[in-house]
Amino acid sequence: MTLTDAATSLHEQLVHEHSAHNYHPLPVVVAQGSGAWVTDVEGRHYLDCLAGYSALNFGHRHPDLVAAAHRQLERVTLTSRAFGNDQLGPFCAELAVLTGKQRVLPMNTGAEAVESGLKVARKWGYEVKGVPADRARIVVSAGGFHGRTISIVGFSTDPDARGGFGPFTPGFDVVPYGDLGALAAAIGPDTVAVLLEPVQGEAGVIVPPAGYLAGVRALCDDARVLFVADEVQSGLGRTGQVLATRGAGVDADVYLLGKALGGGIVPLSAVVADTDVLGVLRPGQHGSTFGGNPLACAVGRAVLELLADTGPHGMLAAGRRRGAVLQERLGRLVGHGVVAVRGVGLWAGVDVDPRLGSGRAVSEALARRGVLVKDTHGATIRFSPPLVVTEDEVAFAVDALEQVLDELR
């Protein structure tokens, strides 16, 4: 069957007429995906350098993950937590080992993991630290992105995410990201946690100053405050490490994981911490019908197996090698249509010279050349290809960006 642009128009019309208008996607309608590539309904091929905002760290339809899903689909997919299932225990144990923690609270989406982590932190504050009832406070960072639930957008500094959704949940203090002095000033006797991303993804891949995460750890230790690291985007290989926080030589008290944990196949997230933190939860105080379901846990176990390979041919090592190529190649463009490049591992934020056009315009031009990226905050675009991308494919993406910039100059 020969596909034409009419197929794209039809799909876009259906979405426009029947879906809420809460996204502004690029004019590409994907029909298939394999590895680092996708094919649209017209039959055109694209190198996926967004990877589902890092949900597809292992590429589209990784054979090990698809096989795990198929095996579980033939057995049982959902039990709820009213009963046990034979995938939940092994998944929690294996994730605890990989992260160096003792306990796991399985959920579904990244925002659920964040909300669950906030609840746990407050409860820990009341029951363990001894904060008076209803006075717990949590410090967060300006520019951070942790999801779009009502509590989370309440402490967002993004006017689009926040506007029109008040009144908001109280108990949050916002400080500049990377500013240890401001963080120290914000921590008081009722502070129970500091929540931050070790690398701010949605903000444009903002890497904190050297020593910042270690400084956060020290402040939390001094004040008996939980360090909660939102690794929903940064974790599970994106920075070349299992955990970006650990890559900086720091251990958080609580890790929030999601996106790639489900292999790009099923939603799966988790709160990971030691017993002295997650032990504050008792039956009936928190739950999720789908959290810890056998299908998600089976896929999650296959993801953990991929990450457990720390050898030179494993996913983490491959991501570091490809990431070094990406950072070096993008760095050459600074001063040639690019104002700045920030990044770590296989993850980069590129600030395009705003005189050449918006990040959206550059993203659309790249799509026409067969490369998918996404813009954020004006003239910034993000690169986060799957860890299975090759060096030649990385070069293809950066060459395409260079060609687009040349055309715009």
Label each region the model flagged.
Residues T2-R409:
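Conserved N-terminal phosphate-binding loop of PLP-dependent enzymes in the Aspartate aminotransferase
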